[in-house]
Amino acid sequence: MNFSPLPNRVIDAPKHLKTRMIQVRSSYFGYSLVIRPTSIFVGAPRAQSTLESQGSINETGAVYRCPLASGSCSHYVLNDKLNKQFQWLGGSMDGGTKDTDKLLVCAPRFFVPKNKNYGQMRGICYWVRDTVADTPPLSDVRTISLIPSQAEEHFMLELGLSAHVTDDNSGFLIGAPGVRSWKGSVLVHRGEDLAAQGSYAVKMLDSWDWVKNHFTYVGYALSSGYFSSNNRTSLLYVTTAPSSVLNTGKAYIFDVVGEIVRKLHVFHGEQLGEYFGYSVVAEDLNGDGLTDVVVSAPLNALGDSYDVGAIYVFINKGLFKFEKKIIRLPLSSGARFGSSLSKVGDINHDGYNDLAVGAPFAGNGAVFIFLGSEHGLRDEPSQRLDAPSREPGPYGAHMFGQGLSRGSDIDGNGFNDLAIGAPGAEAVYLYRAYPVVKIHATVRSESRAIRPEQETITVTACYRLETTSKARQMQQQELTFRMTIDELLQRVSFAPMRTNEVSFQAQAGLSGSCRNFSVGVHYTGGIFTPIDLELHYELAKKIPHSHEAFCESCAVVDPLEPKYATGTLSFMTGCAAHVCVSDLQLSSKDVNSSFIFGSLEVLSFSYEITNSGEPAYVAQFNVTSSARLPFAKVPGNCRVRHEVMLCDLNGGRALARGDSESLTIIFDVTQLSGQSLTIEAAVSSAGMDQNPKDNTMSTTISLREYAEIDASGGPIDGHIALKEYPYSAEVNNSYEFKSHGPSIIDELTVYVDVPIAYTVTGSAGIKSIFNISSLQMQATHGSELVPIKLYDQTNTLAKEYPLEDSSRRANRKRRELQQDQYAIMPDVNISDILTKENLPANRTLVLDCLRGNWTICVRSQMRVQLKPEQPIDLRISFKVDLNDFVNTFDYLVIFTNVEMFKEGDSTSIALKRNLKPNVIFNYSETPLPIWYIILSLIAGHLLLGAMTYILYKLRFFKRGKKEELKRLLEEHRSETKEPATDCEGNQEEINVEMHSDLEN
């Protein structure tokens, strides 16, 4: 928006510095940038060294300090020893914008050979406390490396692929995405860690238990901010893992407690292979004091175009809830929008921080400036800065925008400037920012109505400037105006030229100025149509769009600010006096006194305006809300500015006696919050009103949350049988808490009570069924882990899930939950369980936290923002020890109870439970007596013999078919003659064979 359209200084890679090795390809001068008040630090990761000690080492990489005044760069030496071939020094670099801030520089490809065949790409980093001196004494340079490891999973550490210095200068982060077979990790250095002198090796955090897969690249990009709405001074960290979850990518907000890494929130990419997490920036974009997150995905595809790029904007709504918006631009394939991100501060001084986004392969490269706003980052860029040259250089594409500095005011005009690196062109471009001014202008007449005999009227144009710049020349600017009046009907005109348009220039300052114009009235026909006035304005002096020097006296105006002002006048007639006295009455109908969040996306109000007096000229209706709600629909006769709707009644014509008009105003309530909403409406006209009290109406609506919630679940493994000593078992339960809306319940407290012991009847003894140390709980809401606090039977905090430093949880008590603070729907009774499961009442022990006075329970507490149809999944496991139980009872029934509570509102929740209990029973096997077996064998043999005899008597074993065939054969022989002698042998053989067949 207010950056110079062309660079004001170009800093080229230093050619005057002598190197022994020839530079055969681009040094990537400008790959990383850190801007300071008088100089720019430039990383050139493929540069040849100027040091004699490294004269034979190829492409060590270098960092240069380039004074802003001369642009003549010098080698900023951080180390002059060891073999640093192809180490990519300057591949990542970060630091604040003051010379007293730390400077962190890394060489992620620093290689340590082990033998002739292999080595370790460990990476190495250097940091200095400040850059006050032109060159740092090498003794003041701290070197950071990792503790060597021979494990293969640590051969490609790439320490320093990303580097980040916190905004408060208290510490820094270094990414190592190659650790543990490319699972990745982050090195966190805080104030207490920065006292070491010289070189030192550090241990990488290993407690990233929630990173399960290899090749996720945790630590690829880094940032930090203040994300917690409960503790706005707690600095938390952000890292990305662009290869997580089937290459859709993730980003994490995390904290470090001791050596434990706590995951607090996860952001997800959407598109396969988009490289979500290539860059990340944490910045408060909407001015609410909570840090928001922007994550880039430069390989995001748009339609048939590949690698166009996108940025994901996550606006922090508190309680680690973020509102997501994806910004894409209509760029060509391969532009890689989002390859670099940089926070440039509030460049236009509107109270919201802004962002620079690089697309280094959009032609020779481009940088887009996005402005912050009350609702976060604006959808469209306010400015596009293209590479100064469109022709490819000797090393190919310029990659303009690959390197971006932070925003810093280097010229003292109060507005942040920006440095942009083009490593393919080996150049850095400096863009200075112009001051921003705001023009306030109005146009009005001495009276809002023209009397019948009136021949002239006076129109006044007023104007002034508003700016945060302290420069006197910025507080006084020449403005160009163009004013029009009644261009269509030409009933009036500016005197004496008798024209409907007049132009003039005027000097505007911080205090208001006005200019009067005489307007002649020529025609009184068409008196029911109002006269329109428009005043167009702009700065007279334009910023140069050429390679001229920076214009020190120029300013810019936000392009989204109004460029003209309007006014209306009307003809007054049909009234008893010069001023019409109307009687406008405003009423509403069908207004509900309460509203449930989420029940509707829009809220409608119907108004009726009636005039019972003289004609009302220039009758207008305006409406706004206490929450400054946006309007879902704007009628054609209405316009909106700053969440106030102004409507011209009766099409701009006079509203006569007895006339009425109805309007329906529709508000968008998707973002509505609070306890009440007030709608202010009013009507007015050019004349006076008999009863001004009925011209306004204030409607207050109470707001409340309401949700119907189902709590269901129970044992995963069903009933558990204890067969033998030691009578212990693992109990695993799964529960789901699902809201059916309609409202989102903010800060819902969920209590889960689990029986842990019981008191013995008739004594003071207590028997435990499991040890609290074996109790494990994990709750997820969406993809996020929900923090759980576990209180023991004395109401003392015993555990927190995920586990955290025990020193932080000592002696904290839970708040007691009163029975009338929640609504419970009918639940299952203990007697129903005994009947349904057919359990003997005298041999069954039922433990129920809600009903049994003998039951001792532990209570867990969760606080979440519960959205409709986004359930909480809770897993509970514990190991029961019932060695003492089996001698007293055969069955144990354990009821896990759930209660929910919304502080300050006892009617916002309707809880329906369907929770199945755990049933555990003692299963014993009694050995079978030997005489049972003997009697069974004897009885079996007797039964078999009896059945065989019966079948024999029934001729079951008689072969009747065989006897019949034999008889038929004998009859056949007796009826035929004997065969001849020479055939006798054969005949006998045949008979024998036939007989054999019959036998068979």
Swiss-Prot record:
Q: State the source organism's domain of life.
A: Eukaryota
Q: Name one GO cellular component term.
A: external side of plasma membrane
* Keywords, ordered alphabetically: Cell adhesion, Glycoprotein, Integrin, Membrane, Receptor, Repeat, Signal, Transmembrane, Transmembrane helix
Q: Give start-end positions of Basic and acidic residues composition bias.
A: 971-980
From the UniProt record, list the coiled-coil ranges.
none
Which GO-annotated molecular functions does the record name?
integrin binding; protein heterodimerization activity
Where found, per UniProt? Membrane
Task: Indicate the quaternary assembly.
Answer: Heterodimer of an alpha and a beta subunit. Alpha-PS5 associates with beta-PS.
Similarity comment? Belongs to the integrin alpha chain family.
Purpose of the protein:
Possible role in cell-cell interactions. Minor involvement in the establishment of the oocyte anterior-posterior length.
- Specify the protein name: Integrin alpha-PS5
Q: Which organism is it from?
A: Drosophila melanogaster
